[in-house]
């Protein structure tokens, strides 16, 4: 499972090291060499678990964006991990406490609002 592209529909077999990866970032994390780019790719569909090959060239049409076995659309916009927005700082919170150990705002509020 890819931690970079959350909706990866296929796994890609690399030509350089023959490993199955979900994205280029995954390859860069596990390999000590750059990714070898080729025009032909071997893929495994994550829906039907069957392997197939595609040729990336100038004549690709819309039908080449689907798995030939189950018609799963694998050329889609990637959904990547989005950072959680930080909560706004309450005017009641003492700003000097924000620098203490870089704590989350929720943790600071829990500590400062305790009674007794």
UniProtKB/Swiss-Prot annotation:
Listed A to Z, the keywords are:
Cytoplasm, Metal-binding, Zinc, Zinc-finger
Keyword Transmembrane applies? no
Q: Where does Zn(2+) 1 bind?
A: 2, 4, 23, 26
Alphabetized PROSITE patterns for the sequence: ZF_CHY
The record's annotation in InterPro entries points to: Mito_Tim_assembly_helper (IPR052604), Znf_CHY (IPR008913), Znf_CHY_sf (IPR037274)
Q: What is its main location?
A: cytoplasm
Q: Which GO terms describe its biological process?
A: protein import into mitochondrial intermembrane space
Pfam families found in the cross-reference section: zf-CHY (PF05495)
Protein name per its UniProtKB record: Uncharacterized protein C3B9.05
Q: What is the source species?
A: Schizosaccharomyces pombe (strain 972 / ATCC 24843) (Fission yeast)
């Amino acid at each position: 499972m890819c931690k970079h592209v959350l909706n990866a529909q296929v796994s890609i077999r690399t030509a350089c090291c023959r490993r199955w990866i979900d994205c280029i970032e995954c390859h860069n994390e596990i390999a000590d060499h750059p990714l070898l780019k080729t025009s032909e790719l071997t893929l495994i569909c994550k829906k039907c678990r069957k392997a197939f090959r595609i040729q990336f060239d100038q004549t690709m049409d819309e039908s080449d964006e689907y798995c030939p076995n189950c018609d799963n659309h694998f050329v889609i916009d990637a959904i990547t991990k989005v950072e959680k927005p930080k909560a706004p700082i309450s005017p009641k919170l003492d700003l000097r406490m924000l620098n203490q150990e870089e704590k989350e705002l929720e943790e600071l509020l829990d500590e400062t609002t305790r009674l007794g």
